[in-house]
Amino acid sequence: MEKDLKKMYRTVVSDHFPDRLSITFGDVTLEYRKKTWKITQNNGEIVEQGLRYGENPGQEAALYELVNGNLVLGECEFISPGMGLVSSLVEEDMIQAGKHPGKINLTDVDNGLNVLKFLMDKPTAVILKHNNPCGAASADSLARAFERAYRADRVAAFGGCVVLNRPVNKETAEVIANYYLEVVAAPEYEDGTVDILKKRRDLRIIRIKRIDRLAEYRTLRFVDFKSLIDGGIIVQQSPLCRVLTPDDFILPEVKHNGRVYRINRKPTDAEARDLLFGWFVEQGVTSNSVLYVKDECTVGIGTGEQDRVGVAEIAVFKAYQKYADALCFDRYGISYKELELAVRKGEKPKEMKQEIDEETVRAKGGLQGAVMVSDGFFPFRDGVDVGIREGVTAVIQPGGSVRDWEVIEACNEANVAMVFTGQRAFKH
């Protein structure tokens, strides 16, 4: 008999983790309570359970909320109980659940909040897949912010999670309902919007009540745990982003072989706005990473690579691919890959694809006038040269390489502005 492999993705795995968890640091004990939810299944049965499964089907997992304990280590005071976001979700917040959430559903929302805490001044949308942003944008309206974030990478956004920093209105709900997403999370949903969103039967509609106070979390630290395969644990403080306004930028100036190298051009106000936006999105991207931003919208995001010049090139490749895909969808109502296949099978004329390709190359994948963001310093100028060739006009990076002088020289040759942050933004 044929096995229905799809069933494993719907099956809730009963976990054996305890209802209470305590972690002691010296004389301070942090106490956690496991989260479970009563959710009505498709067959009408109400099942009380925690996470559906962990990273993969079959992996038991549990979510715990911090309920007691105030930890101070040295001069660092960690987040206190009562500040829950994802970990304090209750049934009423799961407006449409469909099935119990899995680990990745909730960690996607969490990382979206991690980015949005820096971007609360304007309506902003962050779309995530596998805990990485695939599109992020700010705009004058929430609907426009979502649409820009989605178009930044339509392919990756399919089945993704969108986190929004404003209550969802009808205009935004109508736009979201046009696309297939797994999760939408927002501070609130205005009257009539939930019915619109429920047209997508499998969409998880989640309310995060404290999003309106998300800016407070910029300076709140938590204990970050990493377990090793031998059962050991590494603990670290969560990072604090020191760059919060353009006033925090550092203008590059270094000495090499007795000569002083300094950047010739400061960023314009528009460039500074994009640099700051990109640096905030960078806080949620897996390292090594390089991203390109234009008009407070991501253009290409390179994630999780082992060399910096390589990830800069991958982000360029993605920008071209995503630009061509959006162009193709606007013009023909199909994805670029669908057009590519149709041309290969002789179902559509090759000129259709050629036109898209030529227009994408002329526009340099939307990279002309964009800014370049790097979570680590450039060890050689080759990384920044990748962006310069595509027409970027400004760069933000930590600085601190022995070849900073070389990177400064590359930017000056192209009249490209550059700023240092003085702080790395690695995330693993």
Language model features: what each stretch is:
Residues 178-214, 236, 366-428:
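C-terminal binding/interaction regions
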Residues 1-195, 199-253, 271-280, 284-289:
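Active-site loops and adjacent core secondary-structure elements that bind or stabilize anionic groups
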Residues 134-155, 299-380:
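Glycine- and Gly-Pro-enriched alpha-helical subdomains that act as flexible
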Residues 147, 170-174, 313-316, 381-389:
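Amphipathic, non-transmembrane alpha-helical secondary structure
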Residues 264-269:
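Active-site/ligand-binding-proximal alpha/beta "capping" segment
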Residues 293:
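Short, acidic, Ser/Thr-enriched surface-loop or helix-capping motifs
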Residues 118, 284, 321-325, 389:
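Conserved helix-loop functional segments at active or binding sites
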